């Protein structure tokens, strides 16, 4: 019992010494001092007391030091909080007498030190002067720098208006390139109406220039007449076609067809491809009795609804069609035409 009481006293004394050593930062010296004090007791009791004191010192160093450092951490946070409070004072609204908490406002208002209400107020007092917050500069300006009813200062509005008034959209406006746009009278698509060019006509036909005119077809019929090769069914017609399409086998076949050019003035025969040949014949085998008739139709000019058609020559081809007993023949006048810009007409007549 005495030994246990002594050990308890030594342990309590060692803890007290450890606490004092922690306060004075002399822990190791206290341990060296605690050893001789227990010389009156047994060696086992002294060893137990020393072990208890060492354990108590270890627990104190593990638990007490972080606990002592915690207030410093709190002070640092408090300092930051105080700094935040000071910063909150620095980030407070710049308007005199405004105590709005900017920590609940947007970052824009915190950065420019103005609350949301005073950012839109027409007149506020800042540092004893009546000012207004500019929406574009994000700063307070004197009232003289604002126009009536404007939320931005005059300097920023002038630059903004100059940028907006630049005529950039007119050069790139797609409506100006459309054919139906009335402001600009031009079109991307050119007009495709053909126009007669007198110079081009002179280059194509330097020896044969005639004023352009339209052609109208007019027929004069006395009575309907059937050709002999059309009355014997289909055999005569087929034979006639075959005979008309075959090449000339003798000079007599070619002698019955003649081409006259009454309007080709001064053009050589070899340079006139527009004189057509008519191969209408009444018999399969032409006879010498069949005459050759050449006629020239005088040009008759009349208005026409046909547009852009011109006759480059008035050459006609006359083919004699005989029914076997008559001497006078039936002839057809066929003008050779090309497509140009005409204003007058040339007749197409069928005479029987």
From Swiss-Prot:
- Identify the residue span(s) of motif Bipartite nuclear localization signal: 150-166
UniProt-annotated stretches for the region Disordered: 68-88, 152-174
Localization? Nucleus
The record's listing under Gene3D superfamilies reads: Transcription factor, SBP-box domain
Concerning InterPro entries, the annotation shows: SBP-like, SBP_dom, SBP_sf
* Superkingdom: Eukaryota
Annotated Zn(2+) 2 binding sites: 134, 137, 141, 153
Can you list the GO cellular component terms from the UniProt entry? Answer: nucleus
User: Which GO molecular function entries does the Swiss-Prot or TrEMBL record give?
Assistant: DNA binding; zinc ion binding
Protein keywords: DNA-binding, Metal-binding, Nucleus, Transcription, Transcription regulation, Zinc, Zinc-finger
What does the entry list as the binding residues for Zn(2+) 1?
A: 93, 98, 115, 118
Q: Where are the zinc fingers (SBP-type)?
A: 90-167
Composition-biased stretches, type Gly residues, lie in 78-88
- Pfam families for the chain: SBP
What is the purpose of this protein? Trans-acting factor that binds specifically to the consensus nucleotide sequence 5'-TNCGTACAA-3'.
Q: How does the entry describe the domains?
A: The SBP-type zinc finger is required for the binding to DNA.
What is the recorded name of this protein? Putative squamosa promoter-binding-like protein 19
